[in-house]
Design a protein with these regions (language model features):
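Substrate-binding clefts and catalytic carboxylate motifs of secreted carbohydrate-active enzymes
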Residues: 1-98, 110-111
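Conserved structural position at the C-terminal beta-strand
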Residues: 70, 107, 171-173
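Short aromatic-acidic-glycine turn motif
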Residues: 90, 125-140
Length: 185
């Protein structure tokens, strides 16, 4: 079913551009009459979004908070926020509800925020009754899915496992605190 409730979504992240660009194109998709974009609390203007198209701004990059607010008539009805994150310091494993054990491995900064542009090479291993079936990072990676190591893409790697008894899933990368997830069967 198509959703109709108001929604706004900032495409991408708000970390420094890898290419050093000073001006960053920001796209915002919205189900609202108009969208207003704010950088560190200062308005960058509004765009009409009633035609269902995205709104776009050319924003001078500055670290901090990028906030998009969607309006119906003149009332704010939805918002989306991106924050500049710090450097990755540790890995984190998150279980995803699924028919089979599925995990997302992410990088976190010192404040515990997901670093969306992190790209470390991550090695996975399992202990006990846990077996790694596949890994994937959603890019055009030529490494076969069954290989338990790969480079993170857009700050995430998916890990599929089989669990026959209690055990653990471990993620490790050079220079980062490893992650360990205990699984009880």
């Amino acid at each position: 079913l198509l959703r109709t409730e108001p929604r706004v979504h900032i495409l991408g992240h708000w970390n420094a551009p890898a290419d050093g660009a000073k001006i960053v194109p920001v796209w915002v998709y919205a189900r609202a009459d108009r969208v207003e974009l704010f950088l560190n609390g200062a308005s960058l203007g509004t765009r009409d979004t009633r035609d269902g198209r995205h709104a776009e701004w050319q924003v001078p990059y500055a670290p901090g908070e990028l906030r998009a607010v969607g309006y119906k008539e003149d009332a704010p009805v939805c918002e989306d926020v991106r924050h500049t994150t710090g450097k990755p310091v540790k890995l984190h494993l998150i279980p995803v509800e699924s028919d089979m054990p599925l995990f997302t491995c992410e990088c976190l900064d010192e404040a515990g925020r997901t670093v969306p542009d992190a790209a470390p090479y991550v090695r996975f291993r399992a202990e006990g009754g846990v077996r790694i079936l596949a890994t994937g990072s959603d890019n055009a990676d030529p490494i076969p899915p069954a290989v338990p190591e790969r480079q993170m893409y857009m700050g995430q790697i998916a890990v599929y496992a089989r669990v026959s008894a209690s055990g653990a899933l471990i993620a490790e990368a050079d220079g980062l605190v490893p992650a360990r997830y205990e699984i009880r069967a």
